């Protein structure tokens, strides 16, 4: 026996074979760069990125995990999402979220002695 034959015998057949085409069933594959919606029965979260949600609209980026009623799938994606009332950008699992914050800053008052 050669060494390659020993290696082939050591690996179980179920690890070498491709999965059947019908294993995905009703779960469509999400394409990279797509924005994921949070709607009835679907919850999406992002691992390895920082972000925020305002008013129920969320962004995703980096590597996301989609949890449905029947399955959990890992979806690698690089994308830009939307946060209501502000701007967000996702680049390589690092996010920058900017929004308008209005605060009153009073100017320095001069004393009459100056």
Swiss-Prot record:
Q: Chief location of this protein?
A: membrane
The signal peptide here is: none
UniProt GO cellular component terms: membrane
Is Protein biosynthesis one of the keywords UniProt gives this record? no
Q: InterPro entries from the entry?
A: UPF0444 (IPR028153)
Q: Where in the cell is it found?
A: Membrane
Q: How does it sit in the membrane?
A: Multi-pass membrane protein
Instruction: Tell me the Pfam families matching this sequence.
Output: UPF0444
Q: Which residues cross the membrane?
A: 40-60, 78-98
What keywords is this UniProt entry annotated with? Answer: Membrane, Transmembrane, Transmembrane helix
Task: Give the function comment from the record.
Answer: May play a role in bone development.
Annotated family: Belongs to the TMEM263 family.
**PANTHER family recorded for this chain?**
PTHR31443
**Annotated protein name in UniProt:** Transmembrane protein 263
Organism (species): Xenopus tropicalis (Western clawed frog)
Taxonomic lineage = Eukaryota, Metazoa, Chordata, Craniata, Vertebrata
């Amino acid at each position: 026996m050669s060494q390659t034959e020993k290696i082939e015998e050591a690996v179980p057949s179920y690890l070498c074979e491709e999965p059947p085409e019908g294993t995905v069933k009703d779960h469509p594959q999400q394409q990279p760069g797509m924005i994921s919606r949070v709607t009835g029965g679907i919850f999406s979260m992002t691992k390895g990125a920082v972000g925020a949600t305002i008013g129920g609209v969320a962004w995703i980026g980096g590597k996301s995990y989609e949890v449905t009623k029947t399955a959990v799938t890992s979806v690698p994606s690089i994308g830009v999402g939307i946060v209501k009332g502000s701007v967000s950008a996702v680049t390589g699992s690092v996010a920058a979220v900017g929004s308008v914050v209005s605060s009153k800053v009073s100017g320095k008052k001069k004393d009459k002695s100056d």
